[in-house]
Amino acid sequence: RDLVRSRGLGDVYKRQALARAEEDKSIDGLLILLNTVGGDVEAGLAIAEMIASMRKPAVSLVLGGGHLIGVPLAVAADYSLIVPSATMVIHPVRTNGMFIGVAQTYRNMEKTQDRITGFVSAHSKITKERLEELMLDTKMLVKDVGTMLDGPQAVEEGLIDEVGGIARALEKLNELMKKAAGTEN
């Protein structure tokens, strides 16, 4: 089986790799390995939407960090796993650099955050309300807002399907690929 690899080449290349994987008949499924401290919300959501809309089975495995935009990437797969020591940090959308301090800017950030919470709640078992509660928690992170969940907590909250490692992720992917092959006739 072929693997599609994308090693930090940029979001455009990752989207192109996903499109090629979707079209390539020799690829039966997708294993997504995640370790991210966040990043570009627009690019991350675009990649998450592509993963969620693929016809081929996809399994994600969070190995290290799954911060803000890493959450939609993880839940976009048909099934998600997380190793026990990995973390998922849920916090409000942030920006850096200069921006205009007016109500419209705030509303734009709020809309972007709503897109993230809507996507995550639609592709996992957590409610949008609970996700926002975790996102706006002021008690956990020093001088910050949000929540850090370890692997078992992420499963308990309904963000991720199961605690497991690479062997279990591959086992689940093979199970989904066999199921998909059985329905194609």
Which positions does each model-derived feature cover?
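Single conserved hydrophobic/aromatic residue that forms the stacking wall/gate
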Residues: 2-13
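Short, well-ordered alpha-helix to beta-strand connector turns
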Residues: 9, 77-78, 160
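Terminal peptide-recognition signature
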Residues: 14, 32, 74, 116, ...
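A structural preference for short, pocket-lining loop segments at secondary-structure junctions
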Residues: 14-36
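Stable alpha-helical elements in mature extracytoplasmic
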Residues: 17, 43, 47-50, 66-73, ...
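Glycine-rich beta-to-alpha active-site loop
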Residues: 36-47, 51-97
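Charged, glycine-interspersed solvent-exposed loop segments at helix/strand-loop junctions
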Residues: 93-173
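C-terminal intrinsically disordered, low-complexity extensions immediately downstream
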Residues: 171-185
